[in-house]
Amino acid sequence: MLARFPLYLRLVRMDKPIGSLLLLWPTLNALWIASDGRPRWPLLVIFTLGTLLMRSAGCAMNDYADRDFDRHVKRTADRPLTSGKIRAWEAVAIAVGLSFIAFLLILPLNTLTKELSVVALFVAGSYPFMKRFFAIPQAYLGIAFGFGIPMAFAAVQDTVPMLAWVMLVANIFWSVAYDTEYAMVDRDDDIKIGIRTSALTFGRFDVAAVMACYAATLGIYVWIGVTLGFGLAYWAGWAAAVGCALYHYTLIKDRERMPCFAAFRHNNWLGGVLFAGIAVHYLLAGN
């Protein structure tokens, strides 16, 4: 068992934390806004650990769902499940176990948060199979990656205001942007194996679609900033996020694999500076 532990860590992408961060930033945004910049430490711990656990569970389930496809993709052919180093039932067991632990974390929270967690679990568990049916599965991913937003508002306020759903829509656009960049890396392989991705759906308009999704995301955050009366610190973070998006254009405009992958990874900075703007605004407002 111990000898297989490194394989399990690779299965749940513990060696690649970028995915966890892409889930964490919008969740932290929601926690900070819902609590007026003063989130309780227990909630921070619960949502941070829950994000890590559910992302890991999602990776295990994704590899299970894609095991017959991933062997035909150069980037994924050596994953533990695809290469036969671990078995399918192990991946499912890990996904179920991690999801159960994540659910245990939210047991002390209110009923609404627990009810939303059931929806979140369904969305996260069904996403890996959406690539068979949806032309833009990345939009569904945005719901899965962003469901911590309404859950955070529910945990803090015991209600989910319209603002939370607007933030979720922003996250959907952001997810389509960065995961299209990710899909551009595997475009040729995905054509061969018949997987549906936004990069294939957008075709020659893929770069324009990515930038339009960034514009929609950041446009919604303009509305959020104006509606909540955020100050200079927030707008500095927003401007830095705009700079990140423009930098991504320089990486993806030629549609080369490695620059597109670099753009995907760089979204950690885009999410991070947006959160920093929100956090610093509340820090200054409280002094």
Swiss-Prot record:
Record EC number: 2.5.1.39
TM regions (residue ranges): 41-61, 89-109, 133-153, 158-178, 202-224, 266-286
Transmembrane helix keyword on record: yes
Reactions accelerated catalytically: all-trans-octaprenyl diphosphate + 4-hydroxybenzoate = 4-hydroxy-3-(all-trans-octaprenyl)benzoate + diphosphate
Cell compartments where the protein resides: Cell inner membrane
Pathway assignment: Cofactor biosynthesis; ubiquinone biosynthesis
Enzyme class: transferase
UniProt xrefs under Gene3D superfamilies: UbiA prenyltransferase
GO BP term, example: ubiquinone biosynthetic process
PANTHER family: 4-HYDROXYBENZOATE POLYPRENYLTRANSFERASE, MITOCHONDRIAL, PRENYLTRANSFERASES
Task performed by this protein: Catalyzes the prenylation of para-hydroxybenzoate (PHB) with an all-trans polyprenyl group. Mediates the second step in the final reaction sequence of ubiquinone-8 (UQ-8) biosynthesis, which is the condensation of the polyisoprenoid side chain with PHB, generating the first membrane-bound Q intermediate 3-octaprenyl-4-hydroxybenzoate.
Name used for this protein in its record: 4-hydroxybenzoate octaprenyltransferase
Organism: Burkholderia orbicola (strain MC0-3)
